[in-house]
Amino acid sequence: MAGNAVDNANHLTYFFGNITREEAEDYLVQGGMTDGLYLLRQSRNYLGGFALSVAHNRKAHHYTIERELNGTYAISGGRAHASPADLCHYHSQEPEGLVCLLKKPFNRPPGVQPKTGPFEDLKENLIREYVKQTWNLQGQALEQAIISQKPQLEKLIATTAHEKMPWFHGNISRDESEQTVLIGSKTNGKFLIRARDNNGSFALCLLHEGKVLHYRIDRDKTGKLSIPEGKKFDTLWQLVEHYSYKPDGLLRVLTVPCQKIGVQMGHPGSSNAHPVTWSPGGIISRIKSYSFPKPGHKKPPPPQGSRPESTVSFNPYEPTGGAWGPDRGLQREALPMDTEVYESPYADPEEIRPKEVYLDRKLLTLEDNELGSGNFGTVKKGYYQMKKVVKTVAVKILKNEANDPALKDELLAEANVMQQLDNPYIVRMIGICEAESWMLVMEMAAWGPLNKYLQQNRHIKDKNIIELVHQVSMGMKYLEESNFVHRDLAARNVLLVTQHYAKISDFGLSKALRADENYYKAQTHGKWPVKWYAPECINYFKFSSKSDVWSFGVLMWEAFSYGQKPYRGMKGSEVTAMLEKGERMGCPPGCPREMYDLMFLCWTYDVENRPGFAAVELRLRNYYYDVVN
């Protein structure tokens, strides 16, 4: 996404940010216009792209650097590079399509920072408001949504931001647009944009000498927008920004946005809003007033018998439904927040959380087929009738014939932990039923365990795996902050709601730590998953969030190995001996080096030097943003 790519270039002394071509040329003139003098700037046409401005023979030459789908950067027809800096370094040795070698960077003058683009000015506020009002989220649920889905949200906001702009009038007719432009002031350059059809095309209506001119804005097969034979842009607001600086094929520059009838320009929430003064040279840069629809409740869940809550159709990398709408552009991509398990079922104020964790068996319906089984018994799909909705649930059913009090105690202990947890990346408990068997009723994650899913879907790309393990790190960071130790973190205990949404499950071994504790000491060695355990767990029976970090490193190895078993063919004692010698599992084939480095860091022998989940999540987050953008 544009924002992150720009953030990654801000450290370059020769990066000037969102300056115009003319401003770039002025800087090169200041530098003497010597052959090979160059600077880097943000592309004003392409999201996430850059432009290279080079002096040669006393003239400035400009090259667009586009960000490819795989995250690399290239000048059209040239070779791909990992970053704009790498591209510049390469062209300092090989001209390959440029007028000359890049010889000397023109650095920003002292005290000058890269110029912020119009979208960066609005982005953070737009994202926050969009998430608040689309999903009616608040507090931690809001923050978690923004952190985990920021790349997708940035792209979404960037491509739909025009809908918040005063100059966008949606699906009105040509006649209506003319009438609207002619109302009020007759300032030359007054303009609006309207949607033309369902194929994603628009029309620019521009007032010049009392007449309304119409320019068609077409969308090509790659999704780029342009007036006929004009420059191409990724978004409408980039197109408007460009033509507010120069006519470039229009009869004149865009000056004053024609507002929708009944819309007052000013600051949001201001009852006596003062009109904003508009002038050529960057309309978007001064747009600080945009109005969102009033917050509303989420659409009501479907009735019993309609689509399941964890539908398999969610995919944040592909559009859902029809491609283009008259008012919407590309349909919004589905995200974890669209599922019914992102928030607690009790987030709805009308769904009153019961004082007791025990549920009424008559309100629970079970399907016959098993989702899974284990030493404890079986897991079945079910439906629980809440006050307002029927909730699709997973039900862990204790073996009845065993009548083992220890199994019952384990189930109740797990329920005791789960009832205290509420996070989008942790499977929540709905309650317990005591009937023909003891039952633990939980949120449904229909796609099943992460390890099995990856074993069966080896086509899943790295960025999808990184997305999922980042979500797990967010859930574990929440556990760490809540003073809980999981003690059984493994890919088999991460369940998928969709291909792009993971939740941590199986809290049977989990322990709550007192405020004055930072570890739990087990009294005896149990049936432990030793291959996932840190040395201090095996040697001293000590468990902490730091030992969960070790397990998380093993989980990452499982994920990037597409569900392979760690330390395959080795006994627990052999694994322990291997770790004591300082040896670790090797990097899975094809795994990004940055991800293996993080695994290795998680496997730091000394618990004091091992990072906590706050550091692990942040490192994963930054890498995830980088590869997805």
UniProtKB/Swiss-Prot annotation:
> Which coarse location class describes where this protein primarily resides?
membrane
A Pfam family this protein belongs to? Answer: SH2
Modified-residue entries (Phosphotyrosine), positions: 27, 46, 130, 290, 317, 342, 346, 358, 478, 501, 519-520, 540, 623-625
- Which residues are ATP-binding? L371, G372, S373, G374, N375, F376, G377, T378, V379, K396
Gene Ontology annotations of biological process type: adaptive immune response; amyloid-beta clearance; angiogenesis; apoptotic signaling pathway; B cell differentiation; B cell receptor signaling pathway; beta selection; blood vessel morphogenesis
Region of interest (Disordered), residue spans: 289-330
Report the GO molecular function annotations: ATP binding; integrin binding; interleukin-15 receptor binding; kinase activity; non-membrane spanning protein tyrosine kinase activity; phosphatase binding; phospholipase binding; phosphotyrosine residue binding
Q: What does its activity-regulation comment describe?
A: Autoinhibited. Intramolecular binding of the interdomains A and B (also called linker region) to parts of the catalytic domain keep the catalytic center in an inactive conformation. The phosphorylation of the interdomains or the binding of the SH2 domains with dually phosphorylated ITAM domains on transmembrane proteins disrupt those intramolecular interactions allowing the kinase domain to adopt an active conformation.
- Superkingdom of source: Eukaryota
In what way is this protein post-translationally modified? Answer: Autophosphorylated. Phosphorylated on tyrosine residues by LYN following receptors engagement. Phosphorylation on Tyr-317 creates a binding site for CBL, an adapter protein that serves as a negative regulator of BCR-stimulated calcium ion signaling. Phosphorylation at Tyr-342 creates a binding site for VAV1. Phosphorylation on Tyr-342 and Tyr-346 enhances the phosphorylation and activation of phospholipase C-gamma and the early phase of calcium ion mobilization via a phosphoinositide 3-kinase-independent pathway. Phosphorylated on tyrosine residues in response to IL15. Ubiquitinated by CBLB after BCR activation; which promotes proteasomal degradation.
Subcellular compartments: Cell membrane; Cytoplasm, Cytosol
Location of Phosphoserine modifications? S43, S201, S270, S289, S291, S310, S313, S344, S373, S573
Region of interest: Interdomain A: 107-166
Subunit details for this protein?
Interacts with LYN; phosphorylates SYK. Interacts with RHOH (phosphorylated); regulates mast cells activation. Interacts with NFAM1 (phosphorylated); probably involved in BCR signaling. Interacts with VAV1 (via SH2 domain); phosphorylates VAV1 upon BCR activation. Interacts with GAB2 (phosphorylated); probably involved in IgE Fc receptor signaling. Interacts (via its SH2 domains) with CD79A (via its phosphorylated ITAM domain); the interaction stimulates SYK autophosphorylation and activation.
Say which family it is in: Belongs to the protein kinase superfamily. Tyr protein kinase family. SYK/ZAP-70 subfamily.
Protein name from the UniProt record: Tyrosine-protein kinase SYK
Q: What is the native source organism of this protein?
A: Rattus norvegicus
Which gene name belongs to this protein?
A: Syk
